[in-house]
A protein has these predicted regions:
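Short amphipathic alpha-helical segment within the helicase RecA-like ATPase core
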Residues: 1-186
Length: 186
């Protein structure tokens, strides 16, 4: 309650009890918006991930988002990773093929308030890496087959391999036939 600038009683009057996933949006006179999101008594990393996602979805039109992990009583790497993932994945929009670009603004900066900077920084880095990988997987899965065929996928993956340290093995039609991949060839 201290962080959002309202007493527990005032929050309860708004119908907010702090239950997992529950949220209330509180506009302030200075133009900022505070979003209180419930995480329960002893939040798990999953609860914190979900809470970060709820906060970001509620803060859609705001460029700067601050998530207070300290109020949730956490300062460890796993929770920081979960909060980062929740925030970034909630902001994901398929950029896809469209005549009308997505004009919905997403946040430009994300600040996580906490203690234990070294552990939190490590968790944030891991969360960013995992979120980027998920963005790529979502983009590829959401792209219609007419716009992303096997050769396109080959180019994307071979371009990513040196940067991200993985090997790529490309099979041609004959290789696939020898491997018994008739269904894939069909």
């Amino acid at each position: 309650p201290r962080t959002v600038g309202m007493s527990r009683r005032d929050l309860e009057r708004q119908g907010f009890a702090g239950e997992v996933g529950q949220s209330v949006v509180i506009p302030r006179r200075d133009g900022a918006t505070v979003i209180a999101v419930g995480v329960g008594e002893r939040p798990s990393s999953g609860d914190l991930r979900d809470a970060a996602a709820v906060a970001v979805r509620n803060a859609q039109r705001h460029q700067d988002v601050t998530l207070d992990l300290l109020s949730a009583g956490s300062s460890n790497s796993a929770d920081a990773r979960a909060v980062t993932e929740g925030a970034l994945l909630a902001a994901y929009r398929y950029p896809g093929i469209t005549a009308k670009p997505d004009t919905q603004p997403r946040f430009a900066s994300l600040t996580i308030v906490t203690s234990g900077a070294a552990a939190v920084e490590r968790g944030v880095r891991e969360g960013v890496v995992r979120s980027r990988a998920t963005y790529l997987a979502r983009d590829l899965a959401n792209t219609p087959p007419a716009h992303l065929n096997a050769r396109d996928l080959e180019v994307i993956v071979t371009d990513l391999a040196p940067t991200h340290g993985f090997d790529v093995e490309v099979f041609d039609e004959n290789d696939l036939e020898e491997m018994g991949c008739g269904g894939l060839l069909g």
